């Protein structure tokens, strides 16, 4: 259906937030998310100020994962499995990509346990799209 002059497109049918609200919203996102570039830069610089969790299956992790990541599927996140990490440590979680809600499920579990958490947006797909290399289970052996 063509857009007639004076009609709104689906983009503008709902008004955009005012700039102050938009600023508050987008600034808050940085408290919840990080991206593949920032994680890669931190790994390359040798930073250890966060724990990177691959929350996919052990099989997916073994095939390819982000270097330095620890495999802990989101369904296995519990106090016992986190006991080795200081309570103030930040966790950065990722899964397959935008089509997967495993990272969100992991973030909910961690937050419910009082742990600090961010999601690495893009997940494995984002990491691959940026051209970053992966580690495999064979490399760990």
Model-identified regions with their sequence ranges:
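Short, glycine/charged-enriched secondary-structure capping and boundary segments
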Residues: 66-68, 106-109, 132-134
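Short beta->alpha connector loops at strand-helix junctions that form conserved
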Residues: 72-75, 121, 138
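Short active-site oxyanion
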Residues: 46-52, 67-68, 90, 116
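Alpha-helical scaffolding within the catalytic cores
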Residues: 76-81
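Short loop/helix-cap segments at secondary-structure boundaries that form the rim of catalytic
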Residues: 61-67, 127
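Short, hinge-like loop/turn segments at secondary-structure boundaries
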Residues: 70, 88, 134-138
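Flexible, polar/low-complexity N-terminal or interdomain linker segments that lie immediately upstream
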Residues: 1-52, 56-63, 136-141
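Catalytic cysteine-centered active loop of the rhodanese-like fold, especially the PTP/DSP P-loop
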Residues: 82-128
